[in-house]
């Protein structure tokens, strides 16, 4: 049949059947070996043809029940194109047998061919015209409504597995057909006995090895052999299929699949006999399929008894071919495989077909197989206890993992089960970073925990650290995995890595643990700071009420603008002996302001700097008095009153003020402690960033003194800061004064520099009482110095912090702009300081101690910012001084407070500028 595979029925000369069959016989054995799919038509030995063909022809009974059963699986028919059968179940069933018979007939060339084609004709259409038997008409009719499926024509080679199954079911129908054809076969015809069938099967066996498709027939043949008489014809019929099938072993496998179908065989006796045989073979095949090799079993001696091992070998061959197809990912071949047993096929490692497809990365093949086999197979584990998803992770097949996790039930494996770890455990175990990254992203989207532990209490970080995969550890840490968890052995991941000798991983994990603990501490400190801020706010509210009460008293007593604590205050002239109380009270707000600034800075540095800055600005405005933004003049007046009157009222209010100041000092210490800690944590780096936001709050240019002091030495500033924080409000000021004196050197007053601009501003503003001015000046410088000291902490720590570079880059413009003028400004300021200090140094000292406290506390608010900016930006103290000076003058108009204060404070700032330039 090899040559005429695609012949038209008309072209076949049935009178020439003998020669035709001879040619096909010559080629068939080779073909069978080459192509299992074509074995049906070609794989029949000439000797077997005589018996088998006659028996087949004799057994031309039309199947009815089995045909129906078989119709469910309409495999691509194993018949040569000539035999294209209609899709009738009978036809389909008979097609395989008929095809086989046709081949046999043609090969036999004897009268068998003639009759058999008739049988085949109905089913296959190949034998239709030659049909000598009574069924030729049927064959013709079937040919007429026969529809050529491209699958049948083109996929014939691959039909073998499905066709085998089909042929198996067809075998029963074929048996019926054989009954019809018994008279037809002239050679063995009705006489064909089990012996003939056996001989045919044995003859066919050598070729059968290669054709699993025929195994169903073989199995049926063996069953038929049991029906030796009438069934003997069927047996022979079946035996030809055996011959063609060439897989005595496979029949067993298929018999397993088709046992039920054979049972449904209309011929009860046939079914009975077939069933025991098939069952025996099927079970035997399952148990011993691996035991027997088809070649050995194929020997002509093999008969029905030997068909079991033969079928097994055939089954093994089929399984092997399926495994190879899946390994290669040839999806086009899959449809031609028998689909019933796919889920039972495993390789030597316990891998099912899904394991194999996933491990090889054949995503399309995996999807197709999953649809055929069902998603339950995705839960099977191989000898390594890996599911297909786990095996895909082991082999780094990201696409397969992606599809299984996102599209199938394998998503359940993202969580640890009672007995098995999760997929990220496998990814960490096998070092698959890319897959781990995708899994973590997916788990984050799905809200699945990354810290689930396996039965040993190991998290994914533990597993990755035990196997030394640093990249996986880093990926897990980036996605927030917990590195401090302990497994059942009480080990952290870092300890596990150390125990396994992965020092690099353990070091990395130790660093991460340290950072985590620091971060937790920072969080705690932030909470504390927030609480303290709340306390401060309440204190500020109380102070505000107190100040408002003092307001009326303060306004009643006018005085020369002695205290230039704020630029506007220079113009305002209010002096009252009672104002001392106010000034003292005001000093507390100043301290609180400073504290609040620090607190807000540290807090904002940890969280959202900008948002917190705005909030802190609002709080500060409230603390300073809601009037700061609205009524700057009033506040300036108040500050003047407080400063001037501070000394007189100090004694009366000493006790409550001291208490408050102690409280404030304590708060301040806490704040500075937290600030220093945050600085070390590189949190302070954001302080400068936050300060620019506060420019609006910095209404007064006080930094002259601060800058001078900072110029002289940062160390002295540090000492002063420490003293400042440690000392209560009253003591603080004298320290700062001393420091400023020593630093200035020119004048006894700490505010030598600031005094000059202050005097100027006062003169243009009100031109009254110069002595008061100097006294005010020291007050202003002292606050400046305190603010500078406070600020100094942040810049110093900033130098150490990694973010200091960022700060410097941000403030670079300031540094560049003011670098040169710094020297000039320093000189003039020093000179001015010298002159003014000489004149009014004593008074300044005396009042500065009292007023200083008020001013310092008040000053730090504005000075703090400018100094923060300048210090953080320019790490040279010299630059800091001038940058602060100019910054204040330049920025004042821009700030919300500055606009109002500028009107009053402008003369001072302009005067200071002019003097600096002149010098």
Curated annotation (Swiss-Prot):
SUPFAM superfamilies, alphabetized: Ankyrin repeat
Cytoplasm as UniProt keyword: yes
Basic and acidic residues biased stretches: 686-700, 833-842
Name by which UniProt lists this protein: Synphilin-1
PTM comment, free text: Ubiquitinated; mediated by SIAH1, SIAH2 or RNF19A and leading to its subsequent proteasomal degradation. In the absence of proteasomal degradation, ubiquitinated SNCAIP accumulates in cytoplasmic inclusion bodies. Isoform 2 is subject to limited ubiquitination that does not lead to proteasomal degradation.
Polar residues composition-biased segments: 299-308, 844-854
Expressed in which tissues: Detected in brain (at protein level). Widely expressed, with highest levels in brain, heart and placenta.
CC terms in the record's Gene Ontology section: cytoplasm; cytoplasmic ribonucleoprotein granule; cytosol; neuronal cell body; nucleoplasm; presynaptic membrane; synaptic vesicle
Keyword Repeat (UniProt): yes
Note: Constructs encoding portions of SNCA and SNCAIP co-transfected in mammalian cells promote cytosolic inclusions resembling the Lewy bodies of Parkinson disease. Coexpression of SNCA, SNCAIP, and PRKN result in the formation of Lewy body-like. ubiquitin-positive cytosolic inclusions. SNCAIP isoform 2 is particularly aggregation-prone. Familial mutations in PRKN disrupt the ubiquitination of SNCAIP and the formation of the ubiquitin-positive inclusions.
Disease as annotated in the protein's UniProt record: Parkinson disease: A complex neurodegenerative disorder characterized by bradykinesia, resting tremor, muscular rigidity and postural instability. Additional features are characteristic postural abnormalities, dysautonomia, dystonic cramps, and dementia. The pathology of Parkinson disease involves the loss of dopaminergic neurons in the substantia nigra and the presence of Lewy bodies (intraneuronal accumulations of aggregated proteins), in surviving neurons in various areas of the brain.
Subunit record text: Homodimer. Heterodimer of isoform 1 and isoform 2. Interacts with SIAH1, SIAH2, SNCA, RNF19A and PRKN. Isoform 2 has a strong tendency to form aggregates and can sequester isoform 1.
Species per Swiss-Prot/TrEMBL record: Homo sapiens
SMART domains: ANK (SM00248)
Protein's cellular compartments: Cytoplasm
UniProt-listed InterPro entries: Ankyrin_rpt, Ankyrin_rpt-contain_sf, SNCAIP, SNCAIP_SNCA-bd
Coiled-coil boundaries: 515-552
Signal peptide (from-to): none
Tree of life domain: Eukaryota
ANK repeats: 349-380, 384-413, 419-448, 456-485, 603-632, 699-729
GO BP annotation list: cell death; dopamine metabolic process; regulation of inclusion body assembly; regulation of neurotransmitter secretion
């Amino acid at each position: 049949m090899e040559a005429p595979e695609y012949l038209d029925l008309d072209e076949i000369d049935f009178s020439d059947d003998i020669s035709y069959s001879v040619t096909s016989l010559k080629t068939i054995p080779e073909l069978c070996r080459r192509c299992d799919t074509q074995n049906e038509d070609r794989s029949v030995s000439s000797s077997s043809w005589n018996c088998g063909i006659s028996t087949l022809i004799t057994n031309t009974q039309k199947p009815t029940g089995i045909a129906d059963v078989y119709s469910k699986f309409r495999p691509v028919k194993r018949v040569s194109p000539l035999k294209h059968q209609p899709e009738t179940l009978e036809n389909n069933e008979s097609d395989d047998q008929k095809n086989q018979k046709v081949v046999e007939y043609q090969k036999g060339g004897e009268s068998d061919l003639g009759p058999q084609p008739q049988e085949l004709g109905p089913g296959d259409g190949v034998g239709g015209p030659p049909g000598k038997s009574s069924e030729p008409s049927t064959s013709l009719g079937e040919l007429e409504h026969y529809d050529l499926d491209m699958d049948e024509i083109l996929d014939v080679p691959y039909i073998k597995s499905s066709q085998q199954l089909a042929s198996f079911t067809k075998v029963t129908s074929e048996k019926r057909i054989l009954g019809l054809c018994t008279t037809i076969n002239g050679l063995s015809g009705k006489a064909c006995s089990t012996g003939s069938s056996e001989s045919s099967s044995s003859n066919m066996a050598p070729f059968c090895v290669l054709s699993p498709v025929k195994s169903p027939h073989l199995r049926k043949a063996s069953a038929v052999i049991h029906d030796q008489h009438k069934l003997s014809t069927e047996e022979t019929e079946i035996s030809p299929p055996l011959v063609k099938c060439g897989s005595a072993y496979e029949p067993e496998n298929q018999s397993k699949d088709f046992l039920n179908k054979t049972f449904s065989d209309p011929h009860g006796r046939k079914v009975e006999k077939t069933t025991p045989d098939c069952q025996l073979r099927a079970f035997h095949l399952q148990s011993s399929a691996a035991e027997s090799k088809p070649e050995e079993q194929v020997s002509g001696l093999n008969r029905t008894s030997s068909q079991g091992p033969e079928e097994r070998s055939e089954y093994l061959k089929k399984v092997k071919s399926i495994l190879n197809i899946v390994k290669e990912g040839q999806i086009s071949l899959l449809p031609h495989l028998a689909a019933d047993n796919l889920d039972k096929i495993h390789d030597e490692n316990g891998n099912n077909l899904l394991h194999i497809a996933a491990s090889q990365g054949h995503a399309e093949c995996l999807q197709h197989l999953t649809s055929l086999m069902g998603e339950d197979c995705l839960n099977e584990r191989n000898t390594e206890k890996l599911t297909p998803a786990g095996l895909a992770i082991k082999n780094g097949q990201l696409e397969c993992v992606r599809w299984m996790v996102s599209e199938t039930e394998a998503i359940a494996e993202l969580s640890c089960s009672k007995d098995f770890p999760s997929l990220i455990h496998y990814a960490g175990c096998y070092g698959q970073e890319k897959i781990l990254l995708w899994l973590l992203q997916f788990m984050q989207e799905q809200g699945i925990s990354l810290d689930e532990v396996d039965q040993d209490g190991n998290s994914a970080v533990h597993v990755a650290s035990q196997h030394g995969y640093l990249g996986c550890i880093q990926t897990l840490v980036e996605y927030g995995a917990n590195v401090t968890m302990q497994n059942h052995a009480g080990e952290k991941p870092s300890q596990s890595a150390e125990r396994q000798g992965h020092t690099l991983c353990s070091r990395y994990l130790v660093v991460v643990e340290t950072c985590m603990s620091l971060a937790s501490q920072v969080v705690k400190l932030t909470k504390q700071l927030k609480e303290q801020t709340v306390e401060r706010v309440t204190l500020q509210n109380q102070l505000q009420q107190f100040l408002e009460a003092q307001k009326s008293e303060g306004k009643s007593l006018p005085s020369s603008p002695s205290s230039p604590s704020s630029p506007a205050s220079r113009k305002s002239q209010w002096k009252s002996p009672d104002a001392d109380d106010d000034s003292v009270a005001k000093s507390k707000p100043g301290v609180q302001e400073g504290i609040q600034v620090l607190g807000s800075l540290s807090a904002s540095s940890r969280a959202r700097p900008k948002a917190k800055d705005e909030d802190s600005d609002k709080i500060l405005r409230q603390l300073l008095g809601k009037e700061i933004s609205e009524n700057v003049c009033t506040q300036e007046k108040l500050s003047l009153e407080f400063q001037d009157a501070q000394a007189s009222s100090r004694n009366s209010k000493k006790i409550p003020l001291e208490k408050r100041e102690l409280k404030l000092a304590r708060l301040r210490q806490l704040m500075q402690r937290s600030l220093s800690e945050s600085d070390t944590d590189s949190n302070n780096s954001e302080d400068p960033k936050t300060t620019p936001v506060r420019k609006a709050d910095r209404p007064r240019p006080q930094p002259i003194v601060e800058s001078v002091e900072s110029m002289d030495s940062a160390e002295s500033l540090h000492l002063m800061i420490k003293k400042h924080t440690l000392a209560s409000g009253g003591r603080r000021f004298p320290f700062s004064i001393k420091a400023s004196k020593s630093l200035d050197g020119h004048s006894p007053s700490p505010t030598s520099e600031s005094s000059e601009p202050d005097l100027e501003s006062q003169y243009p503003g009100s031109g009254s009482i110069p002595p008061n001015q100097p006294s005010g000046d020291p007050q202003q410088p002292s606050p400046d110095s305190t603010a500078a000291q406070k600020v100094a902490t942040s810049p110093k720590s900033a130098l150490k912090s990694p973010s200091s570079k960022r700060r410097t880059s941000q403030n670079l413009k300031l540094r560049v702009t003011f670098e040169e003028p710094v020297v000039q400004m320093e000189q003039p300021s020093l000179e001015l300081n010298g002159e003014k200090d000489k004149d009014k140094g004593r008074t300044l000292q005396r009042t500065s101690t009292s007023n200083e406290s008020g001013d310092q506390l008040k000053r730090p608010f504005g000075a703090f910012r400018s100094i923060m900016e300048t210090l953080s930006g320019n790490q040279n103290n010299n630059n800091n001084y001038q940058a602060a000076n100019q910054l204040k003058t330049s920025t004042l108009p821009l700030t919300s407070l500055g606009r109002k204060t500028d009107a009053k404070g402008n003369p001072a700032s302009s005067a200071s500028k002019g003097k600096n330039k002149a010098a």
